[in-house]
């Protein structure tokens, strides 16, 4: 379906955005941009029923996931020592699989008779993850990186 092709195009666009537009920005700005693209895509899917807006939403979702996931991958890889990076990579991949499986499983439980509820749940998850990143993860990551360099 074209929707998934638009997500794939969004992933490719996120590579160019990360390389050229966000290359000189902070990690925090990248996460905020990625989460903003995710929120915009979810809101577009929730409030519009046209085919073209669903393709634009898919593009925004691909951009948001691409930027956010790559930033989390950098965090998971840069924290461990050299010989522990394989474990960090495997942990990251397992967390992706658990997240996808949990999303498929809980989507059917939470949204049984109300299919539009999934948009609001996803929006809540995006907001909570951004707040957690801003308040906990970002500070913890940079504190650990300073300890690692000492």
Regions found by a protein language model. Give the residues of each.
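Helix-to-coil boundary motifs at intracellular loop junctions of multi-pass secondary transporters
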Residues: 24, 75-80
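Loop-to-transmembrane helix entry
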Residues: 1-10
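C-terminal transmembrane helical hairpin of 12-TM major facilitator-type secondary transporters
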Residues: 26-72
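Helix-to-loop junctions at the C-terminal end of transmembrane segments
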Residues: 13-28
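A late C-terminal transmembrane helix in Major Facilitator Superfamily
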Residues: 79-115
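Multi-pass alpha-helical transporter architecture, strongest
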Residues: 116-150
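Signature of the 12-TM Major Facilitator Superfamily
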Residues: 2, 32-33, 87-91
């Amino acid at each position: 379906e074209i929707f998934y092709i638009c997500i794939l195009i969004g992933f490719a666009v996120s590579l160019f955005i990360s390389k050229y537009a966000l290359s000189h920005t902070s990690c925090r700005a990248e996460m905020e941009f990625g989460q903003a693209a995710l929120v915009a895509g979810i809101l577009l899917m929730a409030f519009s029923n046209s085919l073209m807006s669903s393709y634009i939403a898919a593009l925004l979702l691909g951009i948001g996931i691409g930027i956010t996931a790559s930033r989390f991958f950098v965090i998971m890889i840069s924290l461990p020592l050299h010989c522990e990076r394989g474990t960090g990579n495997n942990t990251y991949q397992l967390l992706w699989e658990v997240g996808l499986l949990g999303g498929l499983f809980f989507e059917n439980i939470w949204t049984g008779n109300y299919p539009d509820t999934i948009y609001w749940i996803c929006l809540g998850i995006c907001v909570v993850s951004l707040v957690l990143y801003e308040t906990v993860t970002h500070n913890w990551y940079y504190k650990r990186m300073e300890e690692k360099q000492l």
